[in-house]
């Protein structure tokens, strides 16, 4: 069986075409894609104003998110487990704060009802009996 000669022209064309695709594709994408400043200039003035007003807030939210990720990644547990535990703790803290707020509102309502009836305030009556 006779060995086929190596087709240098075919491999050269393939390498050139592959290089053009590998380098040219991302280069074309970068050339066509507008920058953030160009997009911002295309906004109408109201959207530009709103975007500028919310910029600091969005940057702060992103910084908080990154800091939480850094803090959570220091744990030996998987990050999704740590985030789930943190969410449970946040929900628990929110429910505690809500119950404290409800207790304060209840106390304020009781005080208002006592004042309407003409009874002395509860805190004042407890101080005089001691």
From Swiss-Prot:
InterPro entries: Cbp4 (IPR012420). Residues 111-130 are annotated as: Disordered. The chain crosses the membrane at residues 7-29. It comes from the Eukaryota. Residues 93-118 form a coiled coil. Signal peptide: none annotated. Pfam families: CBP4. GO terms for cellular component: mitochondrial inner membrane. It is found in: Mitochondrion inner membrane. Keywords: Chaperone, Coiled coil, Membrane, Mitochondrion, Mitochondrion inner membrane, Transmembrane, Transmembrane helix. It is a single-pass membrane protein. GO terms for biological process: mitochondrial respiratory chain complex III assembly. Belongs to the CBP4 family. Essential for the assembly of ubiquinol-cytochrome c reductase. It has a direct effect on the correct occurrence of the Rieske protein, core 4, core 5 and apocytochrome b. This is Assembly factor CBP4. It comes from Chaetomium globosum (strain ATCC 6205 / CBS 148.51 / DSM 1962 / NBRC 6347 / NRRL 1970). The lineage of its organism: Eukaryota, Fungi, Dikarya, Ascomycota, Pezizomycotina.
């Amino acid at each position: 069986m006779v060995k086929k000669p190596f087709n240098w022209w075919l491999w050269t064309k393939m390498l050139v075409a592959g290089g053009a695709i590998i380098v040219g594709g991302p280069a074309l994408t970068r050339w066509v894609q507008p920058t953030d400043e160009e997009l911002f200039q295309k906004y109408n003035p109201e959207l530009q104003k709103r975007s500028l007003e919310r910029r600091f807030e969005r940057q702060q939210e992103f910084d908080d998110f990154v800091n939480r990720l850094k803090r959570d990644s220091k744990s030996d547990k998987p990050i999704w487990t740590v985030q789930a535990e943190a969410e449970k703790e946040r929900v628990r803290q929110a429910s505690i704060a809500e119950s404290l707020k409800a207790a304060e509102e209840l106390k304020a309502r009781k005080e208002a009802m006592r004042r309407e009836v003409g009874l002395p305030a509860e805190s004042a009556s407890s101080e005089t009996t001691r």
